């Protein structure tokens, strides 16, 4: 396993990034392997944090999924297909925050797997300004809750749960707050992408 992780970090192609991301998001559930996992995680975090190329590739990957923001305070909805006029709350809402938190955890060698915990730890380490960390956590919570509520509505109506929401199904109040949450995510993507997500 150590050799696999070393190879993934040394050659950060898309498949290696995906496999490394799985590793960084793992958490032990107990048993005799917990100590081995901790040692392996510490080593891979050290190696990853010391590899600017690997971090750059992970950051680039984290910025691929952008919030669905359109012009004039609207949403950029899916234009065709089964989910036309919907937004993807997972890939364009929850995933961008998870990816940003993972990158910060790698940069700071933060051995945490939970997104909220990673963001709080990054704030405590001075990697994200306190106000920005709080805003991003609140945005993440709102997007995640909106996703769960939408899935519950789908199930209640006899349909299969998915990650797609039609903004037209929301109230003006709900749309405004969801859009504000997406703006927070986009702003943080820009800040971290340009190395500005630190106090100062």
Question: How would you describe each model-predicted region?
Answer:
Residues 1-200:
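A nucleotide- and high-energy phosphate-metabolite-utilizing enzyme signature
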């Amino acid at each position: 396993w150590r050799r696999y992780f070393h190879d993934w970090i040394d050659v950060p192609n898309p498949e290696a990034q995906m496999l490394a991301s799985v590793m960084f998001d793992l958490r032990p559930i107990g048993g005799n392997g917990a100590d081995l996992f901790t040692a392996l995680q510490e080593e891979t975090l050290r190696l990853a944090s010391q590899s600017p190329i690997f971090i750059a590739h992970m950051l680039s990957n984290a910025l691929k999924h952008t919030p669905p923001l359109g012009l004039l305070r609207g949403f950029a909805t899916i234009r065709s297909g089964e989910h036309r006029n919907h937004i993807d709350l997972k890939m364009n809402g929850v995933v961008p925050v998870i990816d940003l938190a993972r990158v910060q955890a790698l940069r700071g060698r933060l051995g945490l797997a939970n997104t909220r915990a990673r963001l709080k730890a990054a704030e405590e380490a001075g990697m994200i300004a306190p106000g920005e960390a709080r805003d991003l956590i609140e945005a993440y919570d709102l997007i995640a809750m909106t996703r769960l509520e939408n899935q519950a509505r789908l199930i209640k109506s006899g349909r299969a749960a998915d990650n797609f929401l039609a903004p037209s199904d929301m109230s003006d109040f709900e749309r405004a707050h969801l859009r504000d949450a997406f703006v927070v995510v986009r702003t943080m993507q820009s800040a971290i992408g340009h190395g500005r997500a630190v106090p100062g």
